[in-house]
Amino acid sequence: MEPATLTRSSSLTRFPYRRGLSTLRLARVNSFSILPPKTLLRQKPLRISASLNLPPRSIRLRAVEDHHHDHHHDDEQDHHNHHHHHHQHGCCSVELKAESKPQKMLFGFAKAIGWVRLANYLREHLHLCCSAAAMFLAAAVCPYLAPEPYIKSLQNAFMIVGFPLVGVSASLDALMDIAGGKVNIHVLMALAAFASVFMGNALEGGLLLAMFNLAHIAEEFFTSRSMVDVKELKESNPDSALLIEVHNGNVPNISDLSYKSVPVHSVEVGSYVLVGTGEIVPVDCEVYQGSATITIEHLTGEVKPLEAKAGDRVPGGARNLDGRMIVKATKAWNDSTLNKIVQLTEEAHSNKPKLQRWLDEFGENYSKVVVVLSLAIAFLGPFLFKWPFLSTAACRGSVYRALGLMVAASPCALAVAPLAYATAISSCARKGILLKGAQVLDALASCHTIAFDKTGTLTTGGLTCKAIEPIYGHQGGTNSSVITCCIPNCEKEALAVAAAMEKGTTHPIGRAVVDHSVGKDLPSIFVESFEYFPGRGLTATVNGVKTVAEESRLRKASLGSIEFITSLFKSEDESKQIKDAVNASSYGKDFVHAALSVDQKVTLIHLEDQPRPGVSGVIAELKSWARLRVMMLTGDHDSSAWRVANAVGITEVYCNLKPEDKLNHVKNIAREAGGGLIMVGEGINDAPALAAATVGIVLAQRASATAIAVADILLLRDNITGVPFCVAKSRQTTSLVKQNVALALTSIFLAALPSVLGFVPLWLTVLLHEGGTLLVCLNSVRGLNDPSWSWKQDIVHLINKLRSQEPTSSSSNSLSSAH
C-alpha cells in the first residue's frame, strides 16, 4: 500500500525571525519554552548561539555569523550536515532576541576578557559541576571530620576552587538576562547565591548554585526522554544511499550492478537504489527487482514483518531484515515518510498548548513579583516582624529570609508542568500516531461526540464489484431492425467506460471498478476531458464507445451516486423511472451502488464492502469507557449504511450526505450537543468535515492529501484502533498536567513558607524547591506509559490476565505431579 503523503498543515505555527545587520541574539535554555532552534536569517547578524552537548543545561555561548540559508550552497553535503547539527541540539533550546545595547556591550567585554570562553568550557564538562558539588559538601562536613586548626583553611580552599566552577557561567547568564531586561529563574538563583556570598554565607551560595545546576541536569534528562522516539527516528534516517548507475537507459539487473554511495538528500525521483540486508530504505520507493522482508515497526508500531516484492510500495525508513532488492524512488528525501514523520512530530512539540502559552506570558511577570516581594521582606521585615536585617546567631535576618523566598518561589516546577504534553506526543509517535501540536490533546479531551465516515474508515475500503446491471435505456431483443445493445456487450462497455474514468483515483469505489476491470477483454476507451463533483460523481467526454449502427464517437458519460445521475436527466419522469429500477433491482439494497450513464443508458454497479476487523470492539470501547456519543456520517444510501452500522454497533446514522451536508452536520451537532466533536475519515469528501471538527483524525495510509492537510491527527497504521488510544491519551495528559500544576504550587508553598519563617536554611530551601521540580518531571514521564480509562479498567484487566494464566499454572502443576 502506498504510504501517505504527510502534508504540513497550513495552521501550523510559524516562528518569525527578525533580520538586522547587527542583531545580537542570546540563545539559551528558557525554562518557560521548549522550541527547536531555527537559523533562517538571510543577513548575517552577530548572535550568541546555543549548543547543548552532554550536560543538558550546558549552553555554549559564542559569537558567530548566521548561516546564509537561502539554499544556494556550493556544497550540498555541507548544507546537509548543517541541518543535522541544528537538529541534534534542537530538542530543548530556544533563541531569545537580545538586541539591547547593554547586552552588546556586556558580551563584547565578556568575550574580550575570556569570560565567554571560560563559561563555555565549564558548561560543557558535567564532571566539573559534580566536582563543585562534592567540594561544597566536603566544606560542609569539615567541622565534623577535619582537625579544628584546619577547618577554616580547608573550607576556604574548597570554596575558592569550587565556587568558580558554578559561579562563572551563572553570573554571565544572570548579567546577560538583566542587561536584556529579563528576570527569570537564572537571575533569581544568581542573586540569591551571590547575596549569600556577600553576607558571609559563601558555602550556602555555592551549594545553591551546584544543586540548582544538578537538579536542572536531571530535569533536562527527563525532558530529553520525551523526545527519545524522535531522536531514534532521526538516527535511523540513513546519511547515504547506494545509487545504481544506469547507462544509456539500460534497465538495471540485480545480478550485474554498478552503483555508488551518494548523500540521501541527492536521490531524485525515478532513481534506482540498491537496498541490502540490514540496510534502511532511504526514501519512499517502489520495489523494482528482488524481494525482502522489511519492518516498519519504528514508523507505525506495526510489529509484524512485511514481505516486499516487485511492484510493492515501501516507505522511507523501512528496515530490510532479509533479502536484496532494487527500488525505484517515488519521492525525494524531503518528501519521504520518515522525514515527514520527524518534521510533524518536532512541529507538534513546538506548537505549544494553551497552558504553556499562558506560562510563557506569566513567567516573567511572576519572577518580577517574586523579586518585589523579596525586597519587601528584606526591608520591611525588621519593622513589621522585628527581624534583624542581617542574620545573627539567634535569628535569621530579613535579607536571608528574602533570599529564601526568592529561591523557593522560583517558577521552575510550573515551567516544566507542560512536559506531560511532550511525553504524550512521543508516546503517540511510538504507536504510529502523529499529532499536529500539543493543543490537539487539549481539544481531544474536551470532545463528547465522535463521527465516523463509513467507506474506508469503518469498512475495509476494499470494495469488490459484485455485479453490473443495465437498468434504464438499454434495448434488448433479436429483431435486427431495432438498434440493439446486447446485455453482455453493455456490461463490458459500462465496465470499460467506468474504469477509464476512474483510472488513478484514490476513492474506494473507483479503485474497486478499476481492479474489477483488470484482466478482462474490454473495449478501449479514451477519456478526452472530465469534471469532478466532490461527494457526487464525475462527468467525462469519452471516445471508443460503439453501437451496432454507427462507429465510435465522442460521448458524454457520467459516473456517481444515483441522485447525481438522476439529476442529470431533465425529465422528472425519467428520473423516477431510474429510481424505481434501482429499487426493483434483483440484487437488493444492501450493496453499495454506483450508477453510470452513457448517452441516456444507465447501468448500475453493485459493490460490497465489509467492516474492518475489530471495529465493533473500538466502537464499544468508545461508548462504554470513553462515554462518547458515536455516529456515522456517510454518503451511501440508508440500507447500505445501516447494514454496516448494525454490524459494528452504531445506532445513530446520517446517510445520503454530500460533503457540504457532512460539514453542516458536524457544525450543527457540535453546537447542539455542546463540547467538541471528533471526525474520523480518509477521503477528499471528508475534508470539509475534518476541517470543521474540533479534532480531525485520518487514516494516513489511504487518505487523500487534502484530508491529511486539514486533519489534526494522522494514524499511520491502516486501522482505527488508534482512535480510542488517542482519546485515552488526551485525557491522561490533561490529568497529568493538572497534577503537575498542583504539585508545582504545593512545592513552592512548602518551600517558601518555612524559608520566610526562618525554619530552614537556604540550601534546604533549594533542595525542597528542586525536589518539587524533579517530582513534576517524574510525574510527566508517566505519560510515556499506555493510558487507561480508569482504575476500574486496570483492575478488570488485571483480573482477566490472572484468569488467563490459571489454566496454564494448573496444567503445569498436573504435569509436575505426574512426574
UniProtKB/Swiss-Prot annotation:
It catalyses: Zn(2+)(in) + ATP + H2O = Zn(2+)(out) + ADP + phosphate + H(+); Cd(2+)(in) + ATP + H2O = Cd(2+)(out) + ADP + phosphate + H(+). Mg(2+) binds at residues 682, 686. The active site is at 453 (4-aspartylphosphate intermediate). Changing residue 105 to V: In strain: cv. Landsberg erecta. Disulfide bonds: none annotated. NCBIfam families: ATPase-IB_hvy, ATPase_P-type. This is Probable cadmium/zinc-transporting ATPase HMA1, chloroplastic.
